[in-house]
Each structure stands twice: as structure tokens, then as C-alpha cells.
């Protein structure tokens, strides 16, 4: 009977029936079964309930209004050069367009008819369909999921987007031999058509139409025109399969620049472990981590080389292991890349004008780490505090209860033309401030370390000119990294040094992948929404429904966004730090709620349930990710020659780290056979295959090449292509964009700002003749090396040794981790207060359970209470204790829920104003009772 009850709803997830057509009694129950079946992510996407029109927003605007006639048998024939172009709009409307309006282009000679009746699309109903009981079926429940039969959605690996079979992009591809396989993926259905088109394009008698989508022309044009590609159809299919495989394998991979949930085990399983995870921390660093786990607002200071970056990486891993959502950010892109995070502006949604435009996402984290905080303006810092308090509805709680961990050195490069945050009252009074003292970088050169400490506070050390080599003014050292004042001079110096080298240059272009979800989520709901639909109100209702049976941590994200002109997509982000049982429970409850949404008067109707959210991003998401990728220091074309000097921009081994310098000695073919054995793993293998196919198929390189670099440490290795990711945070609805490129850059010259936070391995030269006096500039430049033998400088002037007096005073007042005042007066973050309360209740519950077990053992060993045969007061006492124990466990869950409800009430009261405060409190109190 239960199987028959579940079967209709289970068929929804497999056979393409709309959720709204389910019997209401089984809608919320039967959908649970979908979450328990194995999902074939290789399918690109499995689709349910094919009533919702797909395609981009522009494509939807071209759709006819509901009720228009769309089933005429008008036909556009593709057979001659003049009539080759099918106007997609005309085909979709069922109207044959005049040939003179079509652009000149040549298509395959085979006659291909596209009938509007064959690609018709059922218009959206004005109201949900009537509920009809479904005939009971006994289809298979276990095993491979059955694919839907009526889907109009297709995953296009060429563009990385979901699209409709009636969309312009799909009709364009269908006209040249593409089709849809049984996994609802785009594939080469008619290879002969593609081969014939390629032959004609190579002869110059055919071309792809100029009005086709640019992404399709760019993806196919190079392969179809490349004479070295013997079978273009097979090459295109291979290229699409590599994109899909990469998407599948990296679905749960950690985002390298992620602001948030990075799964440690996934990194280790990926092959190359993060060396910062296994690094040995000194005693001082361990104490700082333990202090941070107490939940206080913190500032971690210290001079250059005291291990702040290593500490932040280890702290982030430790906090994530505790189940916390952590945002790793920095005020500069270079520093963000170095610590494995992103910029503060991107992560927190700060506009160019300094406004926080994504306020509703700021409470998505339990802790936010900000590196290089010396470059954070006081005004932005205080605005960040104000916005978090406002969003949390807690005006008296610093940063709304979110733990803020700041790191940096105010005696290094700071913010320009604005006061630093040391002048902020909140920073001075609410933050636990400590200073790291153990020197790590210059540990083997105490005299040089002492000289740097004097420069740090604005003093000119007597031993400086004696320990550092002095060169004539205007000197450029060919064998060194030259630190110059401006980016223009740096680019000019790098280009000139490269031109001086003999031989041909090799330009290696980075491969930019497809936008995708690389995290764990629930299924995605596609909803038809009304004009007055409000995302914030809907999210509140959805969270309320989910929390009816499953407790959702405050930082867990309900992702809801507009994807069509009259539709939204909704899913729940599942942090890897949460337990598997919790994630499974959320998946089940989410599908139950999907069957309840249509009964609520909130302006939304669920029309599709899609297990995978890949390809459901918006053009705005993609544009944002493309802008971020364009600014990434590694995702730029790299021109190299034999003999050129390069800087490693990632960590390959314990000895080859970010900042290592070497020389390109050769180029070899891009293949796994040439990759060092120590670096071979599944992750590198995917990057090599992806980059090789990209260079061959899309760039037209006859032989994809990789550089062989001899580093100053003595190691000579083939540097493999590396994957870099941007995005993966609430601003982009957790979508990420990946790029595979060479983790190298020319290392003849840099600005001082670009190397702040790095340890340079090799010779470094400072050309000071064109540098203007700037506070802390000389100290930052000279502290990039481990010993004075690496360093040389020219045009040194003692007047350039400058330090800000207020920053020097602040630094001297900092305490060490062993000499802190009482922490009782400092605020504690919300996650810590909640954890302490729950821990206390659970400890009481554990004690009661232990007491009951001991009582049962006295009466009969490990026999259950029900089988003890007790009677009278003893039996009544034990039964009462069992009831109390169950109630106590229930109280634990209610306490967690009440804390979150209290936070929501405070936020609501702050918004509604003082006039409605009393009314809101009364109603909230009644609801709690």
C-alpha cells in the first residue's frame, strides 16, 4: 500500500509529470523518494515536469503570447547558399521569412527541414492544471533512474547553459547535425553533416552565419576551419564530453578562491593536499587558533614573516572542521589569491562606490576573515559593522553576531587618503588584539631581521648599507626581480627583457571553462511567478516550511533568484561541513515542501524539479564571473621564451611554493607522461586533458606545449596547467567559473604592492630613484626576502624610511598571545553562544541517559526498560525519567530553533520601527507559546 501511495509522486521525478498534477495527498510524501535514488550527474541534468519554458530571457521575450497559434506547418528549407539561414523567430512563430532578409551564408548541402509543428512548445497555462488522479503503476524504483519523456530542456556543453529545444541556439545547432541524447545533453547526432560543413568551410565556400550566438561561433569555428583536425565531428564531441566530465568531477571540489565552505577531505582526495593543512604550526600560532575558536572578534598583527598567511589558512581549515561557514577574504586580489580566498569587495558585495549591495547575504557566514586589513578604510569598516547589525536586527551586537577575524600589519602599505581602522572605536574597544612575535621568514638571519624591525618603526639601521649590496642609480639587474614604482614601468620592463632573448615566443592562452555549481545543493525548483512576487518574502516562507521538521543553521543559504521574465529558480545550498544525515534530511524536506508551495498564496507555482542546477545561471551571474576572471592574475595570456625568468603563482610542492622563481629551459608536449610523478593525480590529469584539447581544438595549436622550468631551489620540472576558480559565493548564487592556465608570470619586474604578502625566492633588486617617499614602502619591499644576500638596491635615501606615528604607537600597545587581559569584557559571536547553550543542554541529556542506563543495569543489565518486568514506584520512576529524557532532547532542538526565531523577530522589529515594536513583541510571544 505504501508503495502504491509513493509511486505517483516518484514518477514525477522520473517521467516528467508536473508536480502540480499530483494528487495533493501524495505530493508532499511521494517526492521524498526522489532524494533517495542515486542521481546520475553525468547526465548533465535530469528534468521533471516539462511545462516551464526555458531559454534566456531574451528568447522568452520573443515567445508569442499565450493563446497565439503556433502549430502551422510552415517550413524553412536549408538546401542552398541563399536560403541556408533559418530565422529562428520565424520558425518559432510558424512564419516563412522572405529570403532577401537572410544573411549570405552557406550551410551543408543536405536538405534539412525544420517544421514549426515539430518544435512546438506548449504555452504556459494561465492557471495550474486541474488535479486528476493518476493511474497506479508499478515501475521500477531501484536501479537506474528512468529519463523523462517530455522534456524540452537540454544541457548545452558548448555554452554551459540549459536551453530549450525550441530556443534559437538549439535550432542553430540542430541545423548542422546536433541532437539530444538520452541524458538530455547536446551531442553530435549527424556527424556527416558536420564533416561536410567543415570541408566546405576549409575550401572557403561556407561560413557560419554571423547572426548566430557568438559562443557557438567561437566554440565551433576553430575546429571546423582547422585542417589539422581530421574528424571535426569527433573532435567536437570529445570537446563537449571533456567539459561535461570536468563539470561532473569538480561538482564537490573545493573552490580555490572560495569565500566559504571548502571541504578538506575533497581537497585531499583530489590528489594534491594543501601544504598549509599539514604544515607544522609553532606554539604561538596554535595558541592563536585556540583563541579564535572561542568566538571573539580578533585582530592578528605581526611584522612581515611571522607566519600570518599560514596561520589564516590553518585557522580556516580548523573552523570549517568545527562546522562553521567561513569567508576567506583580503583587501587586494593578490593577497586573496595567496590565502586561497577572494577580495573583500567581491565576497561581501561592495560596489565601486563603497555600498553593500548584497546585504541579505552578509549573514550567510559564521566567521569572516579579512587579510591585509591595513588597506581597509575606516569608513568602509564601520559601514560593514552597521549593515551587519541592521541585517541581524541586533543594533547593540557588534557585526550582528558574526565573528570577524582581521589580520595584517599597520606598519606595511596602508589605505590611501583615508584613515585606517585603528581610529575606529569599534575596532579599539570590541576586538581582542594580539601580535605575533616569532619570526619565521628571516629566522636564520637575526641581524637582518633586527634591521628590518628598525625600518618598520621608521628608524634607519646602521647596518643597512653594509648588509645590502648597493648598485648605481638606474640599474636593472637581469638576473633579479626588479621592484618598480608603477604598473606601466613593470609591463615595459617585462616586455623589453623578453624581447632581448633569442628564439621564438610561445603564447599560452588560458582556457575558460563553463559556469557551473561546484558545491552540494538540493534539487532546483523552477517556479512560474507573478509580477508582485517578492523573493525575500518567499525565502522567509520557504525557510519556515523547511524548519518545521529540520533545523536549518542560520548561515545555510536558501538561493532564490529570477531566471526568466516570469519565473524564478530556488534551491538550498548544503555546506559540506554539515553532516551527511543533515544534508539528506534537507533534500527530503525540500522535495516535500515543493509539493506544498502550489497550495500557498505567495505568487509562485512550481513547474519543474531539476536534480542539478547546472546551466540555470543568469546572464548577470555569468557577466559577474567573467569580470572577476578578467582581473585574476593567472587568467591572462602568457608569452614565454626559452631563458625567460618566471614566478610560480601557486603551491606545487613543499619546496615549490607561491613566489618561487625559476627560468624556462624548454618546452615539451602537454601530456601526463611529461608531468613529474610527484604531481600526477586525478586533478592534474583532468587539467592536462582539458588544456590539451583546448589548445588543439579551440586554439588550433598543432602540438600543445608546457614549459620546463628550472627553479632556484635546483629542481627542474614541467609546470602543469592549473585550475583556478572565481565565484562560488552567494553573490553568484554559488555558481563558479573555472580557468585552466599556466600558474606562471614573467618575473623581471613587479610593483611593491603586488608582492606584499609574498616571500620571494631568488635575487631581488630595488630601484629607488623613481619611487616617491611613502610610509612603510621600503620596509615592505625589503622584507620580501629571507636573507640580505638576496637583496640589492640603488639610489637609497634615508628619507624614504618612513612610518606612521599612530600606527607605530598602536603596534607597540599590542599584547602577545601569552599576555592578554581578561576576555570577559569582549563580545562573543552568535555561533559560539549558540554552540555553548546546545552543548550545555546535550551534556545534561547525556548525563540523564547515563543515569538511566545505570538504573536499568542495576535492575537487569542491558535489558530494555520495557522488558524489565518492573512494577510500582520503580517502574513509574524509570518511565518518567525516559519521558523527561525525550523531552530534553526535544528541548535542545527547540532551543536552537528559538534562537533563530528570536533573531528574525529582532530584525523584523528593527524594520517596522518603534511604533510597531510592542505589537510585534506581543504577537511573537504568542507564537512562541
UniProtKB/Swiss-Prot annotation:
Belongs to the helicase family. PIF1 subfamily. It is found in: Mitochondrion. GO terms for cellular component: mitochondrion; nuclear lumen; nucleus. ATP binds at residues 302-309. GO terms for molecular function: 5'-3' DNA helicase activity; ATP binding; ATP hydrolysis activity; DNA binding; magnesium ion binding. Its EC number is 5.6.2.3. Monomer. This is ATP-dependent DNA helicase PIF1. The keyword Oxidoreductase does not apply. Signal peptide: none annotated. It comes from Trypanosoma brucei brucei (strain 927/4 GUTat10.1).
Amino acid at each position: 500500500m505504501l508503495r502504491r501511495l509513493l509511486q505517483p509522486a516518484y514518477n514525477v521525478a522520473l517521467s516528467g509529470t508536473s508536480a502540480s498534477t499530483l494528487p495533493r495527498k501524495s505530493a508532499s510524501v511521494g517526492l521524498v523518494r526522489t532524494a533517495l535514488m542515486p542521481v546520475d550527474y553525468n547526465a548533465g541534468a535530469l528534468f521533471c515536469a516539462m511545462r516551464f519554458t526555458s531559454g534566456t530571457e531574451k528568447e522568452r521575450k520573443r515567445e508569442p503570447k499565450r493563446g497565439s497559434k503556433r502549430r502551422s506547418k510552415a517550413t524553412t528549407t536549408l538546401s542552398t547558399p541563399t536560403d541556408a539561414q533559418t530565422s529562428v523567430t520565424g520558425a518559432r512563430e510558424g512564419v516563412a521569412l522572405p529570403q532577401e532578409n537572410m544573411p549570405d551564408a552557406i550551410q551543408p548541402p543536405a536538405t534539412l527541414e525544420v517544421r514549426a509543428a515539430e518544435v512546438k512548445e506548449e504555452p504556459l497555462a494561465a492557471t495550474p492544471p486541474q488535479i486528476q488522479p493518476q493511474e497506479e503503476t508499478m515501475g521500477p524504483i531501484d536501479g537506474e533512474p528512468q529519463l523523462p519523456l517530455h522534456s524540452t530542456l537540454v544541457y548545452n556543453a558548448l555554452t554551459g547553459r540549459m536551453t530549450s529545444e525550441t530556443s534559437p541556439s538549439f535550432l542553430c545547432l540542430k541545423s548542422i547535425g546536433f541532437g539530444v541524447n538520452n541524458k538530455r545533453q547536446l551531442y553530435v547526432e549527424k556527424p556527416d553533416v558536420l564533416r561536410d560543413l567543415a570541408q566546405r568551410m576549409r575550401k572557403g565556400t561556407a561560413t557560419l552565419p554571423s547572426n548566430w550566438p557568438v559562443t557557438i561561433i567561437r566554440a565551433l569555428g576553430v575546429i571546423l576551419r582547422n585542417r589539422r583536425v581530421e574528424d571535426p565531428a569527433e573532435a567536437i564531441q570529445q570537446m563537449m564530453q571533456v567539459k561535461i566530465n570536468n563539470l561532473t568531477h569538480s561538482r564537490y571540489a573545493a573552490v580555490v578562491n572560495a569565500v566559504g565552505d571548502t571541504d578538506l577531505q575533497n581537497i585531499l582526495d583530489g590528489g594534491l593536499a594543501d601544504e598549509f593543512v599539514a604544515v607544522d604550526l609553532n606554539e604561538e600560532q596554535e595558541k592563536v587558533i585556540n583563541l579564535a575558536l572561542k568566538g571573539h572578534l580578533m585582530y592578528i598583527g605581526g611584522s612581515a614573516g611571522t607566519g600570518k598567511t599560514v596561520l589564516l589558512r590553518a585557522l580556516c581549515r580548523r573552523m570549517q572542521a568545527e562546522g562553521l561557514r567561513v569567508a576567506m577574504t583580503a583587501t587586494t586580489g593578490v593577497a586573496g589569491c595567496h590565502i586561497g580566498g577572494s577580495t573583500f569587495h567581491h565576497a561581501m558585495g561592495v560596489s565601486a562606490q563603497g555600498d553593500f549591495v548584497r546585504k541579505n547575504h552578509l549573514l550567510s557566514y559564521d566567521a569572516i576573515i579579512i587579510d591585509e586589513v591595513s588597506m581597509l578604510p575606516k569608513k568602509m569598516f564601520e559601514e560593514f559593522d552597521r549593515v551587519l547589525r541592521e541585517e541581524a536586527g541586533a543594533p547593540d551586537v557588534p557585526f550582528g553576531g558574526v565573528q570577524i577575524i582581521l589580520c595584517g600589519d599597520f606598519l606595511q602599505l596602508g589605505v590611501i587618503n583615508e584613515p585606517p581602522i585603528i581610529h575606529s572605536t569599534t575596532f579599539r574597544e570590541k576586538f581582542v588584539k594580539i601580535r605575533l612575535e616569532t619570526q619565521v621568514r628571516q629566522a636564520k638571519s637575526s641581524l637582518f631581521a633586527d634591521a628590518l624591525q628598525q625600518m618598520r618603526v621608521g628608524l634607519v639601521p646602521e647596518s643597512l648599507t653594509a648588509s645590502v649590496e648597493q648598485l648605481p642609480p638606474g640599474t636593472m639587474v637581469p638576473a633579479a626581480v626588479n621592484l618598480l614604482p608603477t604598473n606601466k614601468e613593470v609591463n615595459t620592463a617585462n616586455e623589453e627583457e623578453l624581447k632581448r632573448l633569442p628564439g621564438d615566443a610561445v603564447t599560452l592562452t588560458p582556457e575558460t571553462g563553463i559556469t557551473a555549481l561546484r558545491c552540494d545543493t538540493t534539487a532546483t525548483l523552477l517556479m512560474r511567478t507573478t509580477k508582485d512576487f517578492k523573493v525575500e518574502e518567499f525565502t522567509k516562507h520557504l525557510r519556515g516550511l523547511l524548519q518545521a521538521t529540520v533545523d536549518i543553521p542560520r548561515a545555510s543559504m536558501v538561493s532564490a533568484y529570477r531566471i526568466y521574465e516570469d519565473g524564478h529558480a530556488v534551491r538550498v545550498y548544503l555546506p559540506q561541513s554539515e553532516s551527511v544525515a543533515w544534508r539528506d534530511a534537507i533534500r527530503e524536506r525540500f522535495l516535500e515542501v515543493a509539493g506544498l508551495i502550489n497550495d500557498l498564496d505567495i505568487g509562485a507555482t512550481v513547474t519543474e524539479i531539476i536534480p542539478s542546477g547546472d546551466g540555470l545561471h543568469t546572464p548577470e551571474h555569468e557577466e559577474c564571473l567573467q569580470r572577476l576572471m578578467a582581473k585574476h592574475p593567472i587568467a591572462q595570456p602568457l608569452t614565454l621564451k626559452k631563458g625567460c625568468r618566471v614566478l610560480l603563482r601557486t603551491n606545487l610542492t613543499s619546496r615549490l611554493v607561491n613566489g618561487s622563481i625559476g627560468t624556462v629551459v624548454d618546452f615539451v608536449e602537454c601530456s601526463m607522461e611529461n608531468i613529474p610523478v610527484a604531481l600526477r593525480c586525478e586533478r592534474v590529469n583532468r587539467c592536462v586533458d582539458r588544456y590539451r584539447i583546448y589548445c588543439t581544438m579551440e586554439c588550433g595549436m598543432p602540438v600543445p606545449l608546457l614549459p620546463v622550468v628550472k627553479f632556484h631551489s635546483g629542481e627542474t620540472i614541467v609546470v602543469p596547467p592549473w585550475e583556478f576558480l572565481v565565484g562560488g559565493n552567494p553573490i553568484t548564487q554559488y555558481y563558479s567559473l573555472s580557468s585552466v592556465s599556466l600558474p606562471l608570470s614573467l618575473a623581471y619586474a613587479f610593483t611593491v604592492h603586488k608582492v606584499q604578502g609574498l616571500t620571494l625566492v631568488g635575487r631581488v633588486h630595488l630601484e629607488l630613484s623613481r619611487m616617491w617617499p611613502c610610509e612603510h614602502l621600503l620596509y615592505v619591499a625589503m622584507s620580501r626576502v629571507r636573507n640580505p644576500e638576496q637583496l640589492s638596491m640603488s639610489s637609497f635615501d634615508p628619507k624614504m624610511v618612513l612610518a606612521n606615528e599612530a600606527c607605530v604607537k598602536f603596534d607597540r600597545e599590542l599584547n602577545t598571545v601569552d599576555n592578554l587581559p581578561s576576555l570577559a569584557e569582549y563580545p562573543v559571536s552568535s555561533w559560539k553562544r549558540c554552540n555553548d547553550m546546545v552543548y550545555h543542554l546535550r551534556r545534561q541529556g547525556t548525563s540523564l541517559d547515563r543515569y538511566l542506563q545505570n538504573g536499568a543495569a542495576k535492575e537487569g543489565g542491558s535489558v530494555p526498560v520495557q522488558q524489565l518486568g518492573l512494577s510500582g514506584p520503580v517502574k513509574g520512576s524509570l518511565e518518567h525519567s525516559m519521558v523527561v529524557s525525550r523531552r530534553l532532547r526535544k528541548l535542545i532542538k527547540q532551543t536552537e530553533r528559538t534562537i533563530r526565531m528570536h533573531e528574525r523577530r529582532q530584525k523584523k522589529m528593527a524594520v517596522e520601527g518603534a511604533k510597531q515594536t510592542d505589537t510585534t513583541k506581543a504577537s511573537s510571544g504568542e507564537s512562541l507559546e
